């Protein structure tokens, strides 16, 4: 069995887990998430914890048990604490403004870029060069952050662009005469 799947997921107080066939519904203080479990994975609820295991002994079933455990653990963390991702805008005149369910980005193009924020995600701009994305779904938060970063990724010569907070960009040396 997968080493990840061997560890049970503890269910904290205030989190409700319901099984509806192969669908696992998790409800907490910040919202609710659901996941469809693969037929070859077995999920059991025992005294405040969820345990995972393969129904058959195939390598794929064992791998899927670990994947399912990681996904459900992220769902439990999401409905209790939530997830956040910070982006930094580096470059002269690069700015961001949160306007309702959209972010207005000025990234050196001839026009401002308006990025629509999907449902279940909130974005705020504490400063003009910082964007904070929050939500309960880890995958969605990361996807939105990656889409914003892809509008103007950091370039390798000056490092200008949108980068994750704490990201190290390798800067190349300019061509010498």
UniProtKB/Swiss-Prot annotation:
GO molecular function list: rRNA binding; structural constituent of ribosome
One Pfam family cited in the UniProt record for this chain: Ribosomal_L6
Presence of keyword ATP-binding: no
GO CC terms in record: cytosolic large ribosomal subunit
GO biological process: cytoplasmic translation
Entry keyword annotation includes DNA repair: no
Keywords: Ribonucleoprotein, Ribosomal protein, RNA-binding, rRNA-binding
Cited InterPro entries: Ribosomal_uL6-like (IPR000702), Ribosomal_uL6-like_a/b-dom_sf (IPR036789), Ribosomal_uL6_a/b-dom (IPR020040), Ribosomal_uL6_bac-type (IPR019906), Ribosomal_uL6_CS (IPR002358)
Function (record text): This protein binds to the 23S rRNA, and is important in its secondary structure. It is located near the subunit interface in the base of the L7/L12 stalk, and near the tRNA binding site of the peptidyltransferase center.
Assembly notes: Part of the 50S ribosomal subunit.
Family: Belongs to the universal ribosomal protein uL6 family.
Protein name: Large ribosomal subunit protein uL6
Upper classification of the organism: Bacteria, Pseudomonadati, Pseudomonadota, Gammaproteobacteria, Oceanospirillales
């Amino acid at each position: 069995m997968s080493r990840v799947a061997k560890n049970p997921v503890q269910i904290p107080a205030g989190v409700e887990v319901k099984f509806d066939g192969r669908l696992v519904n998790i409800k907490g203080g910040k919202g609710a998430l659901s996941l469809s479990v693969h037929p070859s994975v077995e999920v059991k609820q025992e005294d405040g914890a969820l345990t995972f295991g393969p129904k058959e002994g195939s390598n794929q079933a064992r791998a899927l048990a670990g994947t399912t455990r990681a996904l459900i653990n992220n769902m439990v963390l999401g409905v209790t604490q939530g997830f956040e991702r910070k982006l930094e805008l580096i470059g002269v005149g690069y700015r961001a403004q949160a306007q309702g369910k959209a972010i207005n980005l000025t990234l050196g193009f001839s026009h401002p870029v308006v990025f629509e924020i999907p449902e279940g995600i909130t974005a705020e701009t504490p400063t003009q060069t910082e964007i904070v994305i929050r939500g309960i779904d880890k995958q969605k938060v990361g996807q939105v952050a990656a889409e914003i970063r892809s509008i103007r990724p950091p370039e390798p010569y000056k490092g200008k662009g949108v980068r994750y907070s704490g990201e190290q960009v390798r800067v190349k040396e300019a061509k010498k005469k």
